Amino acid sequence: MNSSCKTRVFNIISIIMVSMLILSLGAFANNNKAKADSHSKQLEINVKSDKVPQKVKDLAQQQFAGYAKALDKQSNAKTGKYELGEAFKIYKFNGEEDNSYYYPVIKDGKIVYTLTLSPKNKDDLNKSKEDMNYSVKISNFIAKDLDQIKDKNSNITVLTDEKGFYFEEDGKVRLVKATPLANNIKEKESAKTVSPQLKQELKTTVTPTKVEENEAIQEDQVQYENTLKNFKIREQQFDNSWCAGFSMAALLNATKNTDTYNAHDIMRTLYPEVSEQDLPNCATFPNQMIEYGKSQGRDIHYQEGVPSYNQVDQLTKDNVGIMILAQSVSQNPNDPHLGHALAVVGNAKINDQEKLIYWNPWDTELSIQDADSSLLHLSFNRDYNWYGSMIGY
């Protein structure tokens, strides 16, 4: 081949190689742009500080997938690929924060649960964040609300007061979960505003927490689950004081395998002379809980403290219902939910650790938390001490 031909071939090869390089660089740039665009659309939640105690991080990573699988099983949902978002905090409008950390749990790209790490027992409330023992809980708390705005490039602050939980975005405050109080109006928009101090702290302290997927080891972490065979959630408490009525109805429906019980009818039986208008304000006392259970053929007795994991396991196998009696740690006499009742649904072993499954009448799904925790961090930013149980429903 003469030199001119060699030169021509070399030039052609050079042109082809340069073209391929340009195309590959373009594809690389477009790919990076797509990733950046996708990343920019992630929901961001404002926090004062992104510093999370290492024990909280470790517990969340170790526990979230097993908890999610166990809760999926309770709702007969298919398991999937579980991932953990970043921790966020919830603030009062004056800037105070609560003592818990919240993680969005993501399954197949959708926020399905919220993992909550809160003080384990009453003594932990007085300890520092680093020294505190934490209880792990999973529920659907505000998960659907977060998922609805997950891909809308939103930047929010999660707030709370006695009426419920709110999302603040661009100066607008929106109620997403209302407290079950009598005469509480479910206002979608609120005139409340974030305090200037909190605004400044959120603005200057750190970058927001991103609700994004983090890879985690996926293992079969649920070793055992045992629940009341026929337990179903049929109703939800909102604008009344009937937590014990809801809990008794749910437990009796489960253990008798029926759907004849409901909270209203139980409260009407307990308060036959009270008007319908005043009935929502009526609460239930321990002697009424025992007497109503007996009237339905159940031998109810009160037991102090939290029942052991083994006791819950055996009672659940025997189709015997347990009602939780809890009291607000704050002891605020003006709190309409100073006392609260919940239904134990069963127990589980996740990562070789003992858990209890329960239903809070304020919620539409079950919750799971550590069996050795006497504190219940419930949906409306309240810590309750589990002081006793009614057994036998």
Swiss-Prot record:
The active-site annotation reads C243, H340, N360
Activity: how regulated: Prematurely activated/folded staphopain B is inhibited by staphostatin B (SspC), which is probably required to protect staphylococcal cytoplasmic proteins from degradation by SspB.
The name this protein goes by in its record:
Staphopain B
Where do the coiled-coil regions begin and end?
A: none
Group of enzyme by EC: hydrolase
Task: Write out the GO cellular component annotations.
Answer: extracellular region
Q: Which GO molecular function terms does the record list?
A: cysteine-type peptidase activity
Q: Which UniProt keywords apply?
A: Hydrolase, Protease, Secreted, Signal, Thiol protease, Virulence, Zymogen
**The enzyme's E.C. designation:** 3.4.22.-
What is known about what this protein does?
Answer: Cysteine protease that plays an important role in the inhibition of host innate immune response. Degrades host elastin, fibrogen, fibronectin and kininogen. Blocks phagocytosis of opsonised S.aureus by neutrophils and monocytes by inducing their death in a proteolytic activity-dependent manner. Decreases surface expression of the 'don't eat me' signal CD31 on neutrophils. Cleaves host galectin-3/LGALS3, thereby inhibiting the neutrophil-activating ability of the lectin.
